[in-house]
Amino acid sequence: MIPTVKELLSSKLEGQAVTVKGWVRTKRQTKSAVFVEINDGSCMANIQCVFDQEKVAEPALAAEFEKTTTGASVSVEGVLIASPGSGQKLEVKANSLRVIGEAPAEAYPLQKKAHSLEFLREIAHLRPRTNTFGAVARVRNRMAFAVHQFFQERGFNYVHTPLITASDAEGAGAMFQVTTLDLARIAAGGAVDYDKDFFGKPAYLTVSGQLNVETYCQAMNRVYTFGPTFRAENSNTTRHLSEFWMIEPEIAFAELEDDIALAKDFILYLVKTALSDCADDLAFFDARIQPGLIDSLGKVAKGSFSRMTYTEAVAELLKHKGVFEFEPYWGCDLQSEHEKFLTEKVVGGPLVVTDYPREIKAFYMKQNDDGKTVAAMDVLVPRFGEIIGGSEREWRLDLLEKRISEVGLNKDSYKWYLDLRRFGSTPHAGFGLGFERLLLYVTGMTNIRDVIPFPRAPRQADF
């Protein structure tokens, strides 16, 4: 393989013949030279290829330059030399150029000008060629790798959980149904005979891999899943997607304190990795998207987490009545504005909130002795709010059966899950981190549809 632009710019190949392949970002000329900037997505930087005007005037090269427009894919050959300019250390003194794929200027939508993020969402198949979305893609790649690094280094096993399920892990009912039945006939007749459906019963796209990964936790101790999940919530907001990726570890013989320690270590690992390995891309986001981003991440990386119970958090919020759009009260689900206020105004840094009311949390969370709260925790960070949600799981069979009945779930659908409590049950805990929400936080992007390659949301399933 030929070297990438990133490899060339960091190489010791000065004075050697090189080949550059990529996409044209800009072409400009002076009386003595023509400058072509090429990017191949391997890094934020372009590599500058310089052609003498005399060379460009040669008929064969002149014909290629006619087709050399922004967006065209090209192959350039030349010698890597020290650059006299201030913008880069190295450039290519070029002697040949070949256009591989044309991008006619009158049709190519990504010309050399600023494009709104809204416009770029309409051309999601081309937006990776912009600086912003190239940077997002590289950070996404590095963070995904870091997720696996973190858990593999700590003895966790990676488990592939199913995308099609008959169980609702959250008990919320906002699930996409999977069927091979003729929907037109169902609409006409009204009744649904699931015996004739593919699985012989109602089946859905998973909202979480947690329940499934718990089965392996109860056999292999430390496990995690990292895959796509689906929610059929009609939420057209900057923080919701219908398809997104979730990271969900589970640890056996563990309680809430173990869960909190793991979550804190995980956040610190990811933030430090982003700062060290994505420096150029974060510098771009800091300059163009979220001023102060690097400083904000740096403060989190120092590792100081405050802690309070949900009850204490609500008490703090009630001291500031009139500040919030949604007034807090004990029993409310904390809103993003509450979480940001707690982290930015009350404690001035990351915060772990524990012991939430059981009525606003999932059925599988361990009930505390007070009968009102569960052994749950959320990790909140400044500028964003909740980034991780987790809990100790209810491992006592009688209490879990009772809770399933209380929330109106079909106990038969959870027989296999209850079996984990019937046979060799252990205290265990875990958490979930929405991968796209992590990326929003690390990049400073403000719309979750801009940190996933092809966003899926209500009325949006293009590409």
Task: Specify the residue positions occupied by each region the protein language model found.
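TRNA-recognition modules of translation machinery and tRNA-sensing kinases, especially anticodon-binding
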Residues: 200, 204, 217-228, 241-255, ...
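Hydrophobic (often cysteine-bearing) scaffold residues that line and stabilize catalytic clefts
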Residues: 67, 90, 136-147, 259-263, ...
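Metal-assisted phosphate- and nucleotidyl-transfer catalytic regions
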Residues: 168-175, 180-193, 265-381, 406-426
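His/Asp/Glu-rich mid-to-C-terminal helical/loop segments that flank catalytic regions of hydrolases
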Residues: 219-220, 255-276, 445
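Class II aminoacyl-tRNA synthetase-like tRNA-binding/catalytic domains
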Residues: 3-252
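Catalytic cores of large soluble enzymes that bind and process phosphate-bearing ligands
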Residues: 135-139, 255-262, 305, 392, ...
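Short coil/turn segments at secondary-structure boundaries
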Residues: 108-110, 140, 157-164, 218, ...
